[in-house]
C-alpha cells in the first residue's frame, strides 16, 4: 500500500516534466491508466488489511476475555479483591487494549517504517529537500516526547478515578435497599458526583493534551510543505529541480511526516491502553487454585472421613487468628453440629474443608489426603455446601438449583426441591421451576433462598454435607419439616452443621464446641449438652 502511494507523486512529476512540455497525450493516458489500476489494487489491499486487522482483533478479544474470566473464576479467595466495583473496572480495561489494537494505531505502526522510503525517494529527486523533512520528523518526535510523560500520569489518574467511580455505582446498585432504609441517598449521591467531577476534570486535561498533540503534528506537517516549496523554488531557479519534481517532493514530504502525526494523535489511546494492560497484568498474576504446573491427587469419590490437625488460620489482612491450633476428627457417616459464639471460627472450618482458604499451619485431611493436594473440582463435587447468606443468580429457579450441575435431569431437580422443602412453593407458582428469580434472589424471602441453596447442595447426592445456619430464616414448621427430610437424606453421609439454634442439636450424633478458634468440647450430643447446662464445657470429651 505504501509503495503504491509513490504512484501519484511520480505520476504528477512525469506529467509536468515530460507530458506537458512534449504534448505527449498518448503517454498521459498510459500513465493515467497505470495509476488508476494501481489505485484499484490499493483499494483491494486496504480492504483486505482492514478485514484481517478486524479478524485478528476479534480473536484477541475472545481469547483475552476468556483468559480473564478463567483467571477470575479460578482466583484464590485470599487474593480476591476487597472492592468488587473497582475490580470489575480492571476487568473491563481489556476493552481499551482491544480498541487500541483495532484503531488506526496498527495502520500507523505499519506505515511508520515506510516514511524512510518516502525520504529516500525525495533524496533521489533532490537531496536538499530531505533536510526540512528530517527536521520535521525530529520536531514531531521531541514534541511527542514532551507530551507523553504528562499523558501517562493523567492516564493512570483517570484509570484510578474511573475505578473508584465504578465502585461507587456497583455498591449503590447492590446495596440500594440498605441505602434507602438508612437514608443514605445524599451520601452516595455526593460521593458519586465528586468522583464524576474528578474524572471529568482529568478527562478534559487528557483531551486537551491529545488535541495539542494532534494539532501540533498537523502544524508541523503543514510547515514542512511550506518550507519544501520555498526551498524547491530556489532549487528550480538554480536549475537543480524541475516543477514536477517540486510537486512530487511536496507530496512525498507530507506522506513521510503523516505517520508520525498519526502516532502523536494516538498517544492518548496508547497511554490508556498501557495503563489498562498493566492493570490486566496484575489480574493475571493473581494466584489461582489450579496453577498450570500443579499436580493434584485425583479422588473422584470421597468417603467423608475428616480430620483437622493442629490447624491455624488468619484471614487475609487480619492480624487476629481465626483458628488457633484447632484439632478435631470426624468419622465418615457422622452427623456433627458445631456450635460456639459469634466469630469463634465455626464457619472458617467449613471454608477450609472446601479448600476456599488454606491453613497457615497444620493440615485439613479428607480420607487421609490433605485438602491442598486434592483437585478442587473433585473436592467440591463431593461436598454439598449451604452458606450463611446464600447467593442466587438472575435466571429461572431450575437454573439456580442446577447451577453447579447444568446437565442434571428433571427427576434429580424435583427430588432436591422436595428435600429442601421447595415443592409447595413451586407448585403454587404458575411457571413452576421456570419461574424467574431476580438478581441475588431479591424476589424470594430469606427462607426461600435458603431452601434453594439446600436444593443445590443435595442435588448431586454428595457424601459430605456442610450446612452453615441452614434454617436461620425458616419458621418453626419449615425447620421441623426440613429436619425430618434431612435425617432421611443424610443416611450414612458425613454432615457438619454450624448453628446457633438449639433446635438443630437433635440432628447431631456428636457436638463440637468451638471458642476463640479452638475446640473446647467434643463428644456425644447428650454428654456435651449436659456439660453445657452444668457450665463444665472443658470436661466434655
Enumerate the predicted regions with their spans.
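Alpha-helical segments in transporter systems
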Residues: 1-10, 14, 31, 35, ...
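Transmembrane helix-loop-helix hairpins at lipid-water interfaces of multipass membrane proteins
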Residues: 1-48, 52, 124, 128, ...
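Transmembrane helices of ABC transporter permease
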Residues: 31-41, 107-157, 230-241, 258
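Hydrophobic alpha-helical segments in the permease module
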Residues: 35-46, 137-139, 210-221, 243-265
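Cytosolic ends of transmembrane helices, especially the final helix of ABC transmembrane type-1 domains
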Residues: 54, 181-184, 208, 256-285
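Loop segments that connect adjacent transmembrane helices in multi-pass transporters
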Residues: 66, 70-71, 75-83, 157-206, ...
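Juxtamembrane loop-to-helix connectors within ABC transporter transmembrane domains
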Residues: 71-117, 174
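ABC-type nucleotide-binding domain
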Residues: 300-541
